[in-house]
Amino acid sequence: MNNNTTAPTYTLRGLQLIGWRDMQHALDYLFADGQLKQGTLVAINAEKILTIEDNAEVRELINAAEFKYADGISVVRSVRKKYPQAQVSRVAGADLWEELMARAGKEGTPVFLVGGKPEVLAQTEAKLRNQWNVNIVGSQDGYFKPEQRQALFERIHASGAQIVTVAMGSPKQEIFMRDCRLVHPDALYMGVGGTYDVFTGHVKRAPKIWQTLGLEWLYRLLSQPSRIKRQLRLLRYLRWHYTGNL
């Protein structure tokens, strides 16, 4: 068997993270032996680890997800520090989503999109069809009422979607995916946060050089100074990192 279809796991603060070497490894793992895996993909960064530490409900949600992977460079560095032999790299959630969509388009895999503003969702659908001929079997923007959730779950199930991506922010998207899987378990679910906004150009992502240097967080801070409180929270994570408490 190609060793790209398997991956080691590493533990940080009790979380079991998949160690992908690069994007190709991630894709080969998710499509092992030509069969798309089923379960829930959750991107893990330092901020999410802090949230998990302080919120038992969120911890339970994240722990239940089968595929937790290092989306943040700080998490990758922590894994490498704790496990010096680890061959793990950052796989950005936004990039992984695009690669999954490209693969889905190539193979005709049915996709259901959830979340985002109505106009952003419509633009996302159009771009996915035009760019990769993605077989979108249904969609729902993020503006639905709680009493409409069950009907939406049934609609997703009836669509036969094999990939369901949910852009509602954390922990809303994790709650949605957990509950939807009770009705439609046979799919790969992925929480994608603000990915639709980035994909359609409504939100600008850091230039590649900033991403390569692991400074995407700094670019976002300079672009949105209001994020300073969120960034200051990360000092706690840094303390864990440098004192070996991860």
Curated annotation (Swiss-Prot):
Keywords: Glycosyltransferase, Transferase
EC number(s) recorded for this UniProt protein: 2.4.1.180
Catalytic activity: UDP-N-acetyl-alpha-D-mannosaminouronate + N-acetyl-alpha-D-glucosaminyl-di-trans,octa-cis-undecaprenyl diphosphate = beta-D-ManNAcA-(1->4)-alpha-D-GlcNAc-di-trans,octa-cis-undecaprenyl diphosphate + UDP + H(+)
GO molecular function: lipopolysaccharide N-acetylmannosaminouronosyltransferase activity
CDD domains with a match to the protein in the record: Glyco_transf_WecG_TagA
Keyword Disulfide bond: no
GO biological process, one term: enterobacterial common antigen biosynthetic process
Superkingdom to which the source organism belongs: Bacteria
Uppermost EC category: transferase
Keyword Glycosyltransferase: yes
Biological pathway: Bacterial outer membrane biogenesis; enterobacterial common antigen biosynthesis
Family, as annotated: Belongs to the glycosyltransferase 26 family.
Function, as annotated: Catalyzes the synthesis of Und-PP-GlcNAc-ManNAcA (Lipid II), the second lipid-linked intermediate involved in enterobacterial common antigen (ECA) synthesis.
HAMAP family linked to this entry: WecG_RffM
Protein name: UDP-N-acetyl-D-mannosaminuronic acid transferase
Provenance organism: Escherichia coli O127:H6 (strain E2348/69 / EPEC)
Highest classification ranks of the organism: Bacteria, Pseudomonadati, Pseudomonadota, Gammaproteobacteria, Enterobacterales
Gene name per UniProt: wecG
